Amino acid sequence: MVQSDCLIASIQKYLDIFDHDATVDDIKYNTYEHFNIASSKINDSLFNAIKHSVYTCLHELYKIIKGFNKLNSYKFCGWVPTFFRKIRAKKYWMKYGIGVDSLSDMKTVIFPLHMEPEISLLQISPEFNNSYEIICWVSKNLPADTILVIKENPWSFGIRSKNYYDRLRKIGNVELARLDTTTEEWINRSIFTVAITGTSGYESIYFNKPVLSYGKYQIINYLPTVRYVANFFETRDAIKDLMCINNNVFLKSKYALHKSLMSCGFSLPRHLDYLDADYLVGDLGKILSGNLYDQYLVKFLGSR
């Protein structure tokens, strides 16, 4: 979630009024249900790869014939190889990945990778979105008893090359996370989380963990348990700082973030019931256009 005037003002307000005697026991983090549903539907079988390849080629051929194909877009059937590479990529991570309990004598830092290319990086964090450079910076500044654990995005298998993964494994204090482990498990096990714009930064606040943030416009950057950095030296200083944060500050961050999200947002209690309902698009369009028209009347005509 990016910054907004409402969220910034709200976080500053709740940080100021936080009482150390205030309870945060009722503040719970619930995993976004759509993520669980979508990730459970991922099918990386050979049959599915062939099926998607045929569909993709036919669909792109149809766009070319109809003249819908964009200039300077992806090359024809350019995504097809990724459908097959993801099968090998998952086997690679299961072979070389480690479990949460594999490093009992070491501390860990978790960095969940983003899906790339993706708008959450290219548009929301245009200043810095180089995951490999982040990994190099963090790994060079960690204490000798700490391992940087990299967790792949479920939708990115097949997009990053085997050579990319090989380069990660050549870094002495970097390990890959097994596919059967969750981000939540690694956050709870780690001393802090590395994030650019992903949800792992927010999850860490709810799980009372510090965050090393590389996303300039992250709203969590305003919290006392988060350090925003943009270069190697800031990374070094922030890591030292994050490892010395007082435990009471974590409650303050959780309280301020949760209260701000609740005050600036709104609930959609039945949104999962209509998640895949295309027939709602027209109705939502009418509602939104009606609201926009009403606001126009009030703002521009009502002031006359």
Show where each model-derived region lies.
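A short, aliphatic-rich alpha-helical micro-motif
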Residues: L103, R169, I187-N188
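Conserved nucleotide-sugar donor-interacting segment of glycosyltransferase catalytic cores
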Residues: M1
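Active-site donor-nucleotide binding/catalytic segment of nucleotide-sugar enzymes
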Residues: L103-Y132, W137, T146, E152-W155, ...
